[in-house]
């Protein structure tokens, strides 16, 4: 079967307004999603992951250690290894983020440096 889901589910029912629009307070309580993106608060997380093609869960109650918001599909060759939860070494943030994206949020950062 599928691997056990990582992270914790966020109950977004509290934030649903009329229709599909969610109005969020300007609260700064960052959380990190399993897509390795930092959301400014839980409400924004709900608003922005509502229409994702896969379920995003909450990885941690802080900003992400490795931010996967801006990275390219073509990665450079620089070597700053990151260890993925799949036990693989990724040569740098870019290749790690691409793997996270492909895995639909099932791979997360195990540690900085080689596994």
Curated annotation (Swiss-Prot):
PROSITE patterns: KAZAL_1, KAZAL_2. Residues 6-66, 67-115 form the Kazal-like domain. Disulfide bonds join 12-46, 24-43, 32-64, 68-97, 75-94, 83-115. The record marks 26-27 as: Reactive bond 1 for trypsin. One of its GO terms (molecular function) is serine-type endopeptidase inhibitor activity. The keyword Cell inner membrane does not apply. GO terms for cellular component: extracellular region. Keywords: Disulfide bond, Protease inhibitor, Repeat, Secreted, Serine protease inhibitor. InterPro entries: Bifunctional_prot_inhibitor (IPR051597), Kazal_dom (IPR002350), Kazal_dom_sf (IPR036058), Prot_inh_Kazal-m (IPR001239). It is found in: Secreted. The record marks 77-78 as: Reactive bond 2 for elastase. The keyword Disulfide bond applies. It comes from the Eukaryota. Three very similar inhibitors found in the submandibular glands are secreted into the saliva. The sequence shown is one of the two main inhibitors. This inhibitor is composed of two homologous actively inhibiting halves: one which inhibits trypsin, the other which inhibits elastase. This is Double-headed protease inhibitor, submandibular gland. It comes from Canis lupus familiaris (Dog). The lineage of its organism: Eukaryota, Metazoa, Chordata, Craniata, Vertebrata.
